[in-house]
């Protein structure tokens, strides 16, 4: 096929990585939802009633198990009270656990978000991990649930949760009464949300006394009442779960639950109501959730009322459920703790109210919560197992029909006495013989085996898909390296060399794969997964001569064994850095070690180099030392106005000092040209406005923080002004086009000032300090790289030594390497092995731009405190966009610096970016095999996050390539025909204009950027 150019390569990189980033969800997290199953319920005699006629479900959104049961300081106690003894904040719920019902911990799965949590509670189903985003908009639950099985369900609460169950159920079966989205204000008192729910329930029963039709409807059986209490989640996000506001909200919820319980009991008076109190997820100490931290996965479960077992008091030497020590300080050691998986709650509710188990439920009925006869327990356990077996049967039929060859799950295969039918008959026989305990044991074993079978079917295609994806990533690495060599080492002079055999070979593999996928009815994504590795490896094979020619150019200088050994050591070192970056995803302090070592990097170029560039080397070392500190600081931060102010003042002073000493910094003399004077004044005025915007952003942020911390809400004026600053700071730089200053330092300062106000508004702690240090370090890096480039291209003994040891320095542009830019010849030099080190530095700094202020065990590491200053109302897409904007700012800064570095190292604009994209998937492939879908939920969430971020960062490099061109558009690097390569010419030929030393544009003024240029010898040889 035709050779891909720069745009084609970058586009292919984006498409490939976006597709393959999704591959983990097709491999590890396929939706477990299937349809076509019959439902199963407990077989009762015609005259027998269900344990309860109705069920009331309380879900305290975001309530941690420990906060529900621990003794904690009274949030309403006077501050001057001497005897501030801890109290139990939920005495009524606690009394249900101690005297009236059964309690335990409900263990949730990741992602610990509201939609997956409610789906598990109400449908008994764990949605695939990617379903978390569907909770941010109306996306009906299109599978069976307890609500859908009920005769009627009344629900009250959040507009984010209730509609998805109502819209996905049988029409008219669910009533959903919600407050408006504007009520979810993080800056307001969130307890009003729970009060609203309790009041609405009271209104319903009050209306029934006046409405006979409603009264009759309420007295039917198989009814469910669902109270979604969002106050704790909203309060926890805003104030943290250890705050007085959160603790006060627990007291309010407990009081409300008590009132509703009493109201229902008084209304019916028949004692046939079951009550379930639980939470969809917990909350970390930082007010976040989403990952698998135990604070997020442990939620309270208290069940009482009709059909529920009374507390089982523990005795010494017996199993109490408290052995793990989690509940040691809850004061509940006297009663047994019965832990469940979150999906088990759906099975429990269905049993209590006499419903069939939801057809997609994988929950195991917790028999310890039931107050019923052994026979009923045995029948319930059997029905529970039959429901899960039915789901396995349907999924197996679908898998068998789709595959060319299917290998059944051995424990559930049709093998005579061990067949499913034989086991079910044995269980029924045991029940008939009143051997209830034995039948329950067999039912439990059969259910667990069915779950293992579902797991087997879920992972059936793993080997096939993982092999294809692995070959795809390896193929991309090989293809990208081949393309880099073809475009930037051989300059497109190599030709493809396809043979008839190779065409037939790769085509046959592709046809075979597509045929299998077509027969199996696979998703369209599978075809792309298969297409990419075939395409990449075919291209690599076709351009194998380019690889050989590139090897001659890049390593042709290496002839001795010691040279090859030195090159091998260098290669291993690069791979070691990439593997260190992999580990840095788990241990941020690896960045600290790397930065400290990197600070000494200039020493490797000898004492002469250090002597010529003392200030520059010191600046780089200082930047590295300061950067090493940030990854030692906690990733989870609390709001610190002092840190915000310090970072803001550093940004302000940087801009102010630049305005004062601009001419000295740029090495420009005062001009007498009227047009130049006007342009200079205009540019300085605009930059002055940018500097002033920083100060204004600090003032507004301090005011907003003070108001929010005082619980006075976000003033409208602050919100409007905050948005005005954010938008205007992004628009102001465009005014510089009216009064252009093309010096690269000026351009970098404009970009720095552009993002400073945004960073101030969206920072909560030390991020502003990081932004300042990061920009300073990048500038030192750009100037240091150019100094090294000039140093290593000079024909010195140091250069000869580096060649002998296998490290070929960069060469200055040769006359043949010419492209046309704006109608003029522009020469780029050939890439060398040493440029891989520059690309690796860029990739390291790119990663540090993300990790220095956070980690990615989960996205929830990033606090929402800052976005409350702009959007106090719950709006996940808008708030998420602001957080992403904050995360992307360092990437924008580094793209501008690399764009300038490309020019100053005289390489093609896309060259270094392409090298980065060639090597970065070494990390991505590591994380692909680290992804887990079982084990601790913290590990699962972490591995997903790691793979996705690594893959998206690689994709983002392609975007940065285009962004860098935008940022440096119009920057003056001198006349293309004369100044490209002038720095090298000065070092090689010694012909320096205006009396500057060869390094003057590095350590002092930048001569090539302000028109003080040297004549490059057009015939100079590399």
UniProtKB/Swiss-Prot annotation:
Its EC number is 2.-.-.-. Residues 1-6, 488-498, 582-589, 636-640, 707-713, 859-880, 932-947 are cytoplasmic. It comes from the Eukaryota. Its main location: endoplasmic reticulum. GO terms for biological process: cell wall organization; GPI anchor biosynthetic process. Pathway: Glycolipid biosynthesis; glycosylphosphatidylinositol-anchor biosynthesis. It is found in: Endoplasmic reticulum membrane. Keywords: Cell wall biogenesis/degradation, Endoplasmic reticulum, Glycoprotein, GPI-anchor biosynthesis, Membrane, Transferase, Transmembrane, Transmembrane helix. It is a multi-pass membrane protein. The chain crosses the membrane at residues 7-27, 467-487, 499-519, 561-581, 590-610, 615-635, 641-661, 686-706, 714-734, 750-770, 771-791, 838-858, 881-901, 911-931, 948-968. Pfam families: Phosphodiest, PigN. One of its GO terms (cellular component) is endoplasmic reticulum membrane. InterPro entries: Alkaline_phosphatase_core_sf, GPI_EtnP_transferase_1, GPI_EtnP_transferase_1_C, Phosphodiest/P_Trfase, PIGN_N. Ethanolamine phosphate transferase involved in glycosylphosphatidylinositol-anchor biosynthesis. Transfers ethanolamine phosphate to the first alpha-1,4-linked mannose of the glycosylphosphatidylinositol precursor of GPI-anchor. Belongs to the PIGG/PIGN/PIGO family. PIGN subfamily. This is GPI ethanolamine phosphate transferase 1. It comes from Aspergillus oryzae (strain ATCC 42149 / RIB 40) (Yellow koji mold).
């Amino acid at each position: 096929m035709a050779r891909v150019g720069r745009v084609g390569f970058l586009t292919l990189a984006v498409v490939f990585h976006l597709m393959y980033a999704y591959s983990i969800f097709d491999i590890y997290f396929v939706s477990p939802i299937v349809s076509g199953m019959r439902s199963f319920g407990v077989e009762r005699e015609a005259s027998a009633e269900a344990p309860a006629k109705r069920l009331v479900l309380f879900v305290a959104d975001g309530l941690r198990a420990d906060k529900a049961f621990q003794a904690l300081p009274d949030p309403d106690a006077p501050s001057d009270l001497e005897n501030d003894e801890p109290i139990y904040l939920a005495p009524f719920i606690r009394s249900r656990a101690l005297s009236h019902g059964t309690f335990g911990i409900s263990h949730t799965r990741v992602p610990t978000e509201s939609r997956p949590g409610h789906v598990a509670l109400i449908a008994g189903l764990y949605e695939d991990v990617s379903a978390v985003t569907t909770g941010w908009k109306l996306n009906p639950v299109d599978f069976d649930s307890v609500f859908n099985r009920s005769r009627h369900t009344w629900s009250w609460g959040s507009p984010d949760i209730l509609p998805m169950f109502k819209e996905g159920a049988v029409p008219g079966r669910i009533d959903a009464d919600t407050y408006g989205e504007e009520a979810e204000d993080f800056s307001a008192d969130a307890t009003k949300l729970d009060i609203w729910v309790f009041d609405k329930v009271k209104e319903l029963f009050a209306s029934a006394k006046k409405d006979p039709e409603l009264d009759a409807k309420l007295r039917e059986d198989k009814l469910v009442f669902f109270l979604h209490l969002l106050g704790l989640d909203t309060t926890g996000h805003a104030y943290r779960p250890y705050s007085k506001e959160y603790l006060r909200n627990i007291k309010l919820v407990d009081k409300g639950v008590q009132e509703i319980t009493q109201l229902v009991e008084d209304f019916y008076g028949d004692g046939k109501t079951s009550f379930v109190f639980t939470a969809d997820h917990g909350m970390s100490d930082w007010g976040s959730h989403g990952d698998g931290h135990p604070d997020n996965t442990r939620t309270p479960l208290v069940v009482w009322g009709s059909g529920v077992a009374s507390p089982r008091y523990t005795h010494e030497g017996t199993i109490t459920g408290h052995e793990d020590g989690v509940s040691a300080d809850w004061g509940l050691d006297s009663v047994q703790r019965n832990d469940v998986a979150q999906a088990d709650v759906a099975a429990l509710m269905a049993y209590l109210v006499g419903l069939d188990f939801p057809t997609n439920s994988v929950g195991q009925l917790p028999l310890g919560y039931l107050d019923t006869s052994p026979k009923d327990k045995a029948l319930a356990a059997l029905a529970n197992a039959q429901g899960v077996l039915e789901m396995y049967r349907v999924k197996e039929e679908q898998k068998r029909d789709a595959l060319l060859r299917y290998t059944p799950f051995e424990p559930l295969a049709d093998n005579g006495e061990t067949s499913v039918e034989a086991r079910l008959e044995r269980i029924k026989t045991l029940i008939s013989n009143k051997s209830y305990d034995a039948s329950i044991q067999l039912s439990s074993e059969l259910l667990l085996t069915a779950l293992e079978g579902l797991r087997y079917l879920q992972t059936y295609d793993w080997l096939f898909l993982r092999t294809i994806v692995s070959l795809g990533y390896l193929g991309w690495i090989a293809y990208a390296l081949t393309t880099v060599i073809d475009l930037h080492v051989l300059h497109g002079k190599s030709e493809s060399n396809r043979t008839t055999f190779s065409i037939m070979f790769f085509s046959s593999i592709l046809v075979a794969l597509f045929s299998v996928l077509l027969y199996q009815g696979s998703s369209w994504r599978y075809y792309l997964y298969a297409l990419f590795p075939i395409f990449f490896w075919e291209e690599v094979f076709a351009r194998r001569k380019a690889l050989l020619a590139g090897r001659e150019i890049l390593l042709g200088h290496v002839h001795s064994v010691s040279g090859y050994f030195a090159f091998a050591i260098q290669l291993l070192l690069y791979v070691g850095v990439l593997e260190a970056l992999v580990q840095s995803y788990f241990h941020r302090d690896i960045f600290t070690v790397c930065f400290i070592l990197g600070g000494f990097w200039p020493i490797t170029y000898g004492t002469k180099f250090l002597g010529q560039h003392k200030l520059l080397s010191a600046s780089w070392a200082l930047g590295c030392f300061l950067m090493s500190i940030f990854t030692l600081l906690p990733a989870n931060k609390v709001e610190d106005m002092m840190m915000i102010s310090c970072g803001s003042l550093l940004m302000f002073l940087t801009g102010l000092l630049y305005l004062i000493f601009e001419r000295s910094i740029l090495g420009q003399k005062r001009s007498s040209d009227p047009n130049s004077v006007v342009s200079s004044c205009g540019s300085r005025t605009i930059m002055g406005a940018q500097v002033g915007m920083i100060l204004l952003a600090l003032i507004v942020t301090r005011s907003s923080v003070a108001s929010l911390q005082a619980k006075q809400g976000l003033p409208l004026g602050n919100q409007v002004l905050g948005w005005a600053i954010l938008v205007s700071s992004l628009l102001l730089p465009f005014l510089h086009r009216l009064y252009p200053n093309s010096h690269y330092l000026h351009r970098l300062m404009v970009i720095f000032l552009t993002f400073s106000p945004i960073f101030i508004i969206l920072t909560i702690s030390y991020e502003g300090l990081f932004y300042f240090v990061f920009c300073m370090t990048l500038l030192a890096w750009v100037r240091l790289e150019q100094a090294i480039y000039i140093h290593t291209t000079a024909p010195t003994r140091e250069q000869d030594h580096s060649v002998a040891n296998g490290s070929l320095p960069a060469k200055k542009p040769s006359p043949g390497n010419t492209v046309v830019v704006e109608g003029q010849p522009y020469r780029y030099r050939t890439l060398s092995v040493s440029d891989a080190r520059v690309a690796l530095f860029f990739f390291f700094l790119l990663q540090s731009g993300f990790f220095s202020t956070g980690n990615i065990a989960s996205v929830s590491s990033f606090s929402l405190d800052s976005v409350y200053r702009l959007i106090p109302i719950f709006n996940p897409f808008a708030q998420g966009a602001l957080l992403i904007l904050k995360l992307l700012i360092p990437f924008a800064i580094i793209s501008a610096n690399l764009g300038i570095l490309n020019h100053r190292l005289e390489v093609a604009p896309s060259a270094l970016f392409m090298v980065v994209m060639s090597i970065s998937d070494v990390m991505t492939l590591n994380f692909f095999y680290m992804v887990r879908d079982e084990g601790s939920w913290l590990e699962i969430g972490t591995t997903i996050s790691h793979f996705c971020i690594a893959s998206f960062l690689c994709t983002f490099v392609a975007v940065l390539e285009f962004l860098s061109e935008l940022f440096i558009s119009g920057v003056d690097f001198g006349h293309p025909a004369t100044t490209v390569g002038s720095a090298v010419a000065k070092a090689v030929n010694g012909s320096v204009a205006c009396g500057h030393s060869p390094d003057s544009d590095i350590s002092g003024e930048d001569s090539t950027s302000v028109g003080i240029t040297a004549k490059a010898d057009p015939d100079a040889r590399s």
